[in-house]
């Protein structure tokens, strides 16, 4: 299975565009002209309405993306377009700096809802390049190739790692990988989350426990899902060290 997929080749079918639009009288309008118009930051709502009614230009993925991410696009139009975007178009849209924050959130949620129906290769590609929210969701994928790529996503945050570690659906392989990861395993909050996780290896749990103040460690172990034998070992080591 290839590690990356070209966007055009990896498009996943989405709902078909709305049939409510009619052919515009402006048959001369081309993709290039529409894109040129959409570069105007002060475009009027009437122009967006005219463009949206033009079935010919709305077949263009570039035009749809430009309209959805334009700051002046009427929200009802932008929302309809977002709901019609293909999988990798949703990923691109969610990373657009000009797109409205609430619409980017919707795009992320649509992507998350499709994860169970897209291919392994597409999930691998998304894991490397998607937004923080989608990368966080892919940390819980059952396939190691997916969550391994998500761990290297440049947009992934410490908070996302901690949230994933708190979920009971995380795999043993994922937890062990985080506990050995050169970037994430040294983060204090990640270490605390690992000490609460049932799958953290004993050797790493001992290593992290040594860095936690005794009182806080007791509180962590009180709610930890680690096996009792490991928790007993951690407590015993603290007693031996006189802490």
Predicted regions: what they are:
Residues 1-243:
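Alpha-helical scaffold segments
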């Amino acid at each position: 299975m290839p590690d990356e997929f070209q966007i055009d080749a990896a498009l996943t079918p989405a709902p078909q565009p709305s049939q409510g639009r009619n052919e515009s009288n402006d048959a001369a309008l081309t993709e290039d002209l529409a894109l040129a118009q959409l570069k105007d930051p002060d475009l009027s709502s009437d122009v967006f309405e005219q463009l949206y009614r033009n079935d010919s230009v709305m077949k263009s993925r570039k035009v749809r993306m430009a309209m959805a991410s334009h700051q002046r696009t009427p929200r009802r139009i932008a929302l309809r377009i977002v709901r019609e975007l293909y999988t990798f178009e949703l990923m691109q849209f969610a990373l657009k700096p000009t797109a409205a924050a609430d619409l980017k959130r919707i795009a992320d949620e649509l992507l998350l809802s499709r994860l169970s129906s897209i291919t392994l290769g597409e999930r691998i590609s998304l894991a490397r390049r998607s937004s923080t929210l989608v990368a966080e969701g892919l940390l819980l994928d059952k396939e190691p190739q997916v969550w391994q790529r998500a761990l290297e996503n440049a947009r992934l945050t410490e908070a996302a790692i901690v949230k994933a570690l708190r979920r009971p659906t995380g795999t043993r392989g994922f937890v062990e990988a985080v506990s050995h990861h050169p970037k994430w395993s040294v983060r204090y909050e990640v270490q605390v989350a690992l000490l609460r996780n049932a799958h953290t290896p004993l050797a790493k749990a001992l290593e992290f426990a040594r860095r936690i103040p005794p009182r806080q460690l007791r509180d962590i172990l009180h709610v930890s899902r680690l096996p009792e034998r490991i928790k007993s070992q951690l407590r015993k080591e603290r007693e031996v060290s006189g802490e």
